[in-house]
Amino acid sequence: MAISFREDAKYAMLVPTSMGVRLTPLDGQPFHCSDTFKMQVTSAETNVASIPAFLGMPVKVLTAFVKDSPVARMIKDNLAGRHMDYEGPEIEQGGPWGSRHQFNLADSGYGSRGPRVQNDRAGEVGRLLDTKYFDLERIFGAEGVKIVHLSGLIGALSPETSKFCLDIARAAKSHGSRISFDLNYRASFWKGREQELHDIFSEIASLSDVLIGNEEDFQLCLGIQGPEA
């Protein structure tokens, strides 16, 4: 099946995301035994967007930054180095207990020791993403986007990001952009919000041209029954 794309679009792909950094011990060591780490800028959605960006296609990232944060500056420089345009609010840290960029503590594993990842997301600035920070009419109308890639991670991160992703899907659809939606179910993100997120994910899925997920994703996000045992 062939999918046609809007031809007058400035951007080949757009992704909404919450940016953070990953700390990985050197030489395959366990995290708790290490004192030297490699720090990398990361997000699931920009991992996807890196592919068209490095193939020379124009990509845009919608995210949020902590104002005057050196981590935010590192993230911006990294996105620029991956040939991506970025746009988003500069949010005040609000003191030592305020907003920050998430940390991903990644033990890569070695031999029979499997990899382990711990997400340290308290105060994550990306949870504040909201349509009020963006001119969606300009982005999808005047500028134009061929395809939007949405992830269930950012879609379930907070009530604000859930609505943000739904607003993006609606705006994209109304302006002729294609939509790719990776359901990416995470039980810890859905806890206590099951019905709310089911309704939002179902509407985003109904607007999407491409759905990505395994059997469990479709069952738990969209309520689609699996085969009988």
Model-derived features with residue positions:
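Conserved N-terminal subdomain of the carbohydrate kinase-like
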Residues: 58-152
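Short glycine-rich anion-binding loops that position phosphate/pyrophosphate groups of nucleotides
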Residues: 19-20, 110, 122-125, 153-155, ...
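A short, aliphatic-rich alpha-helical micro-motif
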Residues: 8, 138-143, 202-205
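Glycine-rich phosphate/adenosyl-contacting loop at the front of the ribokinase-like
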Residues: 2-89, 112, 131
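A glycine- and small-aliphatic-rich helix-loop capping segment at beta-alpha/alpha-beta transitions
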Residues: 29-33, 135-137, 166-167
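A generic local structural motif
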Residues: 1-3, 132-137, 197-199
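Conserved beta-alpha-beta core of the PfkB/ribokinase-like small-molecule kinase fold
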Residues: 147-229
